Swiss-Prot record:
This protein's name: Autophagy-related protein 14
Family as reported in the entry's similarity comment: Belongs to the ATG14 family.
Any Gene Ontology biological process: phosphatidylinositol phosphate biosynthetic process
Membrane disposition: Peripheral membrane protein
Primary subcellular site in the record, as a coarse category: membrane
Native source organism of the sequence: Saccharomyces cerevisiae (strain ATCC 204508 / S288c) (Baker's yeast)
Length: 344
């Protein structure tokens, strides 16, 4: 073929049909292909030999390598040397980094050792301070326990003197008046109907005096105080409703003191059941003797109005437990000088 521009001969190009159908063209091309394959095999063998010698050059004789001066082998050897130098440089740089890290860690360890020594000294000082503080706390607790025992002994002594002063005693031969205070009957819901109003009011006054002294010794504040001025019996003119109200306030104060002494629980109590079991005089006597009392728990606290209605029911009903009208009982008719005492 000739170039249509420069008219020089160029490579001949045949179509696929001519190559497959022309025997002369097919044979020539096949022979060329066989020659090329043979040349490639020879070149492949040489390349493999050169590569093998280049990889194992440290095991070959130096003189033999000098006799054979193949440029490909020399290039490969130089490439391998450069690669080894590069690896050596990387290893050297890595070693330097590790040395710097080891040096910094050594400095950090030495600083930590110094801090540990300082902390040990501080800990020893702190331990000594804590031990001294614990000793002081223990001494303070011992002193507080001793003071508490002294205060408790003084309180018990004062309460015993108070009991002896008011002559609180339990009578064995009287069912309606089982307890006495200052040689007078302790008021209760059972004997409220049979005692004269003057005796009832006088008994409540004495119980109020005792409760006031008792709360002063215990150093507690009561919910109610006795604000009514004391008068002689023949001049007393309070109504029965006022006496009942004072009695209810007295019951509330007694329960408050019993809660403080842990004779009854601080939770809401079934006060009607408690009064049915102990009555007012029983509550007062157990408070004086500091005896624990059994009681039932309820969900709500009793109010003054609820207690007032309940006390009226108990006083109006001699059998205690049956419904009755909620009116105050009529006072017993007494003379101005009708005053008597129960002597145990």
């Amino acid at each position: 073929m000739h170039c249509p521009i420069c008219h020089h001969r160029a490579h001949v190009v045949y179509c696929a049909h001519c190559i497959n159908t022309s025997p002369s063209l097919l044979l020539k091309l096949k022979l060329d292909l066989i020659l090329l394959k043979d040349e490639n095999k020879e070149l492949n063998g040489k390349v493999e030999q050169i590569l093998n010698e280049a990889m194992n050059y440290d095991q070959l004789d130096i003189k033999r390598m000098e006799k054979k001066k193949d440029p490909l082998m020399n290039s490969l050897m130089k490439l391998d040397v450069l690669r080894m130098k590069k690896n050596n440089n990387l290893i050297r740089h890595r070693i330097e980094q590790l040395n710097e890290r080891i040096y910094s860690k050594r400095n950090h360890i030495s600083e930590l050792k110094v801090e540990i020594d300082n902390y040990k000294c501080y800990k020893v000082g702190t331990g000594t301070d804590k031990l001294r503080e614990q000793v002081e706390i223990s001494d303070a607790k011992n002193k507080l326990a001793q003071v508490s025992k002294i205060c408790e002994s003084a309180r018990d002594y004062k309460l015993n003197l108070l009991n002896n002063w008011f002559v609180i005693q339990k009578l064995q031969d009287n069912f309606q008046i089982p307890f006495a205070i200052a040689f007078q009957p302790l008021i209760s819901l059972k004997n409220f109907r049979i005692l004269p109003l003057a005796i009832t009011n006088d008994s409540i006054n004495i119980m109020w005096k005792y409760i006031s002294f008792f709360s002063d010794i215990l150093m507690i504040k009561l919910p109610y105080t006795n604000k009514i001025c004391e008068q002689p019996m023949f001049e007393f003119s309070d109504s029965i409703q006022t006496v009942v109200q004072r009695l209810i306030k007295l019951i509330i104060n007694i329960l408050q003191i019993c809660r403080h002494l842990k004779l009854v629980p601080s939770t809401p109590m079934d006060i009607p059941w408690l009064l049915d079991q102990y009555d007012v005089d029983g509550l007062f006597y157990n408070m004086v003797k500091r005896n624990k009392m059994k009681c039932r728990s309820v969900s709500l606290y009793w109010t003054f109005g609820m207690l007032y209605s309940m006390v009226l029911d108990n006083m109006n009903n001699p059998q205690r437990g049956h419904p009755a009208r909620r009116t105050a009982p009529p006072p017993t008719v007494t003379g101005p000088h009708d005053r008597w005492y129960v002597v145990g």
